[in-house]
Amino acid sequence: MNALLIALPLLIGSCSDDNNSYNDPATVPTDIIQTVVKTTDNISIGVSTDKAAYKPGETVRFTVTDGTLPSSAHVRYRHGADVIADENIGSTSWTWTAPQADYTGYMADIYTTDANNQQTIYATIGVDVSSDWARFPRYGFIASYGNDRTSDVIASELSMLNRCHINGLQFYDWQYKQHWPLGGTPDNLLESYKDIANRDNYTSVVKDYIAQAHSFGMKAMFYNLCFGVFDDAKADGVGDHWYIYTDQNHSKCDRHQLPSDWKSDIYLVNPSNKDWQNYLADRNDDVYKALDFDGFHIDQLGDRGTDYDYYGSQVNLPNGYASFIRAMKERQPDKRLVMNAVSNYGSDKIVS
């Protein structure tokens, strides 16, 4: 607004019929005159960085992945219009030390300059310098962990996501059961297990995805509901009184129905129930002991209508989400939490 208020009188003055003044080029200070460089594009080179994001002062490695790099090519690093550095490339792989400014983005231009001072741009790529991925999250997901996911396949997939600067990954439907996410125990991991859709998941594949994600500077977040259990949950220690119901007489448990050939429907428990919170936090502790996940991607199912606890009291799910998030953070304060606000349901409590 200030810029507009200041500019308006200048515009009015310059358009006045009584104003015949003009700027004599000879009176313009030479230190503010910049040479205009004509630029054309010939985007014919593929270039990548070795990570999706970098800490301040970290080494950034660039690699030409496709096309032929001209022998006279330069790389220009800039923040907006401000050029940070400009240097001859000289090879198809080179490094640059990220500046110390945190939470700052840069653009690298690969270009040449001809005898007429005309520049041709062959490639551009961004560089995110941020010490915490949560400042500028760019979230992707993984959803298949079969034995067809070899290390080479995983590397190819994550290389593509890295080129898109994805810095966080949700591991969707990786778990053994909703209420028992780890396949086995930390001391006795299952080599393979059926996921919710009765597909084969391999623990080695999950581990490989995590390790390769970390090599690209990405965070690995395991997915699970905050209040879901399978039909065999009671045999695994889930309490009778933890469930939520669609009636006040605890005769009909609220459940999310799934195809009949899947492992189980999902039955809902009260996310604010302290016993349930402790139970799932224990299961999550096992996950963190066995697998190098960076945090928990928490899911919900949107508005469930009116639900009741075992004792007939109406359940406030958004308040339960807030309570659940606090409990998970208290148990694992160094792990990150993300929660999905399905159709924006409960979002005010999720972020509180």
Regions from the PLM with identified roles:
Residues 8-43:
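Bacterial Sec-dependent N-terminal signal peptides
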Residues 138-141, 169-171, 220-223, 296-298, ...:
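Hydrophobic faces of well-ordered beta-strands that scaffold small-molecule active sites
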Residues 131-151, 222, 226-291:
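Active-site-adjacent "subsite" loops/lids of carbohydrate-active enzymes
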Residues 32-132:
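Beta-strand-enriched, solvent-exposed domains that form extended recognition/catalytic surfaces
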